[in-house]
């Protein structure tokens, strides 16, 4: 019945708050508990909540607002100053995971095309979970977090181009590589121009309207417009939302927007996003794939941790900061889930492997929060010991 959706929302909000609190009491970031509770109340365990189109859309709004908040908290000058490090981290986080995924696929008996796609899937990075963990830890404004966010942007661009190339080369889709690259150029050129000139003008134009919360509404209009524009041109909507947050952070409206959007995001939409990730897991028919799942999870974690960490180390970060950046890039999150769905529909990913890979993606997402907490803790202890 349609009204059962109201109960589902109430259950999601209650369970995420309780699970987040328990996670903090156990010394872990709150996001870990929220991810786990999605598995518990979802189809995999209790089955109280089933995936639906409405929950999916609420989840999409949640991740868009989460990345918009990350953009608001990002220092543009710091982001620009760390662009070389971000690019190196992104490259390290693509090359090693691709090789690891491709070789693993061949060893496990996959066909050539499936192995290539597995390598590309392991290249994906979603820092939305890392962003929440950094907020929990009070580390959003560190150099490491800025580098992670910049690397995620580069990673998204490169992975989309590589995916388009693979689909074209393997003959599974009619993909125009020139058009794919052109769309990326148009997106970022437009975002820079609109963010520099258009966003301040839009905020000034809409803020005097004699209606309630005109400034917040103006900010959300910009946020969702940027996200839509990104999706339209083949860039993840979360990148558009992140860019919108950065653009508004350069205006005088930053603090008011941040103060008023945060309750909207965290009271309703972000909890649905966290639960929806866990709800993607199902344990049906995975008994004979358990070793594949465990092996691929280890490969997925180590290749990102080492590859991204190496990129950071080569651009001036010390060992502990490099480990932090590597840990923050491990999560594949919703980005990899979308790519997996694309691979399944295009024939690049066999149905036999789909469920197992979804579980691997979610395991990497759940591993990220405790890894970030541990690596930041190790750095903080070292800094205190040196004083």
From Swiss-Prot:
Keyword Transport in annotation: yes
Alphabetical keyword list: Antiport, Germination, Ion transport, Membrane, Sodium, Sodium transport, Transmembrane, Transmembrane helix, Transport
Disulfide bridge positions per record: none
Membrane spanning stretches: 29-49, 54-74, 87-107, 114-134, 149-169, 175-195, 219-239, 263-283, 290-310, 324-344, 347-367
Membrane-protein topology: Multi-pass membrane protein
Any single Gene Ontology cellular-component annotation: membrane
Role summary: Na(+)/H(+) antiporter that extrudes sodium in exchange for external protons. Can also use potassium as a coupling ion, without completely replacing H(+). This Na(+)/H(+)-K(+) antiport is much more rapid than Na(+)/H(+) antiport. Can also extrude lithium. Important for the inosine-dependent germination of spores.
Protein's UniProt name: Na(+)/H(+)-K(+) antiporter GerN
Species, as recorded: Bacillus cereus
Taxonomic lineage: Bacteria, Bacillati, Bacillota, Bacilli, Bacillales
């Amino acid at each position: 019945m349609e009204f059962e959706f109201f109960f589902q929302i109430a259950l999601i909000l209650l369970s995420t708050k309780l699970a987040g609190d328990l996670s903090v009491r156990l010394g872990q970031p709150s996001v870990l508990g929220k991810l786990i509770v999605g598995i518990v109340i979802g189809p995999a365990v209790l089955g109280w909540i089933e995936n639906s189109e409405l929950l999916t859309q609420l989840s999409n709004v949640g991740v868009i607002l989460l990345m918009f908040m990350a953009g608001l908290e990002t220092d543009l000058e710091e982001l620009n100053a760390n662009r070389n490090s971000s690019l190196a981290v992104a490259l390290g986080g693509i090359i090693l995971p691709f090789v690891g995924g491709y070789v693993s696929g061949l060893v496990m008996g996959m066909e050539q095309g499936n192995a290539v796609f597995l390598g590309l899937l392991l290249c994906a990075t979603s820092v939305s979970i890392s962003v929440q963990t950094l907020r929990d830890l009070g580390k959003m404004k560190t150099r490491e977090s800025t580098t992670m966010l910049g690397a995620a942007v580069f990673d998204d661009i490169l992975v989309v181009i590589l995916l388009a190339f693979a689909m074209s080369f393997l003959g599974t889709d009619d993909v125009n590589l020139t058009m794919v690259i052109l769309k990326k150029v148009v997106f970022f050129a437009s975002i820079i121009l609109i963010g520099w000139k258009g966003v301040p003008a839009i905020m000034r134009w809409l803020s005097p309207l004699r209606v309630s919360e005109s400034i917040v509404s103006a900010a959300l209009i910009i946020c969702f417009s940027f996200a839509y524009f990104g999706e339209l041109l083949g860039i993840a909507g979360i990148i558009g939302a992140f860019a919108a947050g950065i653009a508004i952070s350069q205006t005088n409206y930053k603090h008011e927007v941040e103060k008023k959007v945060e309750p909207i995001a965290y009271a309703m939409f972000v909890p649905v996003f966290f639960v929806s990730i866990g709800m993607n897991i199902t344990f049906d028919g995975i008994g004979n794939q358990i070793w594949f799942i465990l092996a691929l999870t280890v490969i997925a974690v180590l290749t990102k941790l080492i590859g991204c960490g190496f990129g950071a180390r080569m651009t001036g970060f010390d060992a502990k900061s490099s480990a932090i950046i590597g840990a923050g890039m491990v999560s594949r999150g919703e980005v990899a889930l979308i790519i997996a769905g694309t691979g399944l529909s295009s024939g690049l990913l066999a149905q036999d492997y789909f469920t197992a890979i979804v579980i691997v993606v979610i395991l990497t997402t759940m591993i990220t929060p405790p890894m970030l907490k541990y690596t930041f803790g190790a750095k903080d202890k070292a800094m205190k010991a040196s004083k």
